[in-house]
Amino acid sequence: MNSANVIEKKEFKNDNVNKVNQIKSEQLTADTYYFKPGQVLEYHRHPEGDQIFFVHEGEGVFCLDNGKEECTPLRPGVAVLAPKGVWHKIVANKELIVSQATKQPAGMQSKPI
């Protein structure tokens, strides 16, 4: 059985957002992102699959950009959807722990600056 406790084993990094793979199968992956205040998971998109984020601890902002930027606050208990092919980013206001589930392979493209 695959299982993970993302709260007991917090893995923050000072220089960047830390992405830790928790569980992976042929069709699905679950990762956890550990953010220090001010860290950003920059705009990117997944052309082959939706991505769902679940907030465990902390505060931040989740933004989508599909021609018009829309942002929503993140706090414990919140879940948000990044639809297939839509640019999305996360900004941490405080230490933030967010897990995500995505189909595999979903592909990944960074947004040009």
Predicted regions and their residues:
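Conserved short histidine dyad/triad with adjacent acidic residue
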Residues: 31-47
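Short acidic-glycine-tyrosine-enriched beta hairpin
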Residues: 68-84
